[in-house]
Amino acid sequence: MDSAIKTQFDRCEAEGLCRSDVAGLRMKWIPGQKHLIAQYHPTWQLVKRKASFQKPTMTQPFNPDGFNFTKVKESEVLARVYVKDRKVVFVRDSSDPLPEGVDTLYTILLNVSPICNNHQLLVPNLEKCYNQVWRYDLTENWIVFCENSERDDYVLFFNSLCGFSSVNHLHLQVMYSSSFYATATGSPTLPLPDDFTPSKLPLEYADCRVLFKREFVVCLEVKDWLSQAIKLSIEHDANETAEMGDRKRRELAHCFNELIRACYEQAFPYDVVFCQHGSDIYTFIRRYQQPLEDLHVNPACVELTGVVVYRSEESFDRADQDILMEECKKVVYFEPSIWDDFVRSYVNRIVNN
């Protein structure tokens, strides 16, 4: 799956379709025990896409007059696929009918301002123009995308409205964590975790505490990170049957969907990360989007994983873990009592049903 799409990504780069080139990215380690990465590209200050809204609500309707993916050129399409029988299947002709039982065609688009190699967008049923609101019926399919990747560093990202989504047209982003480490200058602060690997994001080394365990799913709270967050995790056995894998995927999707429903009920913006072949899902539950003005950082999904995109060279050069943490706790975090009530309510929601 990944290699076929990478071929098309390379074609787009060669044709000059990207506003910024991956080779021009500057990356470096940020000193500190969290092993954060800072990233900067000079062109990001020069080219900006107009926002399709100023102050969105979490369920803002789709706006056909704002930027949306129906306006993307065919040359920026990397592939079209659907999900069937636990597999991601490529479509040769978009006019061909989908197989019986399949109702979602995913268009894979070039991200024209890539922050890693093969940075892509996944848009379900592009022409139906869903707004950027989670569709619970697609959760298991997103997990299948992760399961089908050839690579251990495949990561799916989602920013909700009010959580720094810049386009109100339903989409997820695909990135590869090893790309963030490949050209980072300097050295990570020692000691590195024993299980350190480029196939993990900085977030994945954060301390967690267990909130509950179900038959297959473990729910954990991420501690002392850039955002308050919940981690849902399953473990796969190499010898498990396909039916057992389906049961685990369903339970994981159920626990995740209930978490997202709780976010919408409380009007709490959120950002999501699917990683480790879909076995782990992190959800950042955060306050309404607000930039870290002094640092020139928008704390969206990628930034909250520990890959911090700076919008000014000066801020990039001065990147500091402690200052970043302090600012995130002011801008992104809920008050402890609000957060504790939310977590308690979610745990009761799952455990008692």
What are these regions (language model features)?
Residues 143-155, 163-166, 178-183:
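Secondary-structure boundary elements
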Residues 152-166, 170, 267-277:
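A short glycine-rich, hydrophobically flanked beta-strand micro-motif that places a catalytic Asp/Glu
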Residues 242-244:
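A general "terminal functional-core" signal
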Residues 1-142, 177-240, 249-353:
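Active-site microenvironments that recognize anionic phosphate/pyrophosphate groups
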Residues 172-174:
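Short beta-strand elements
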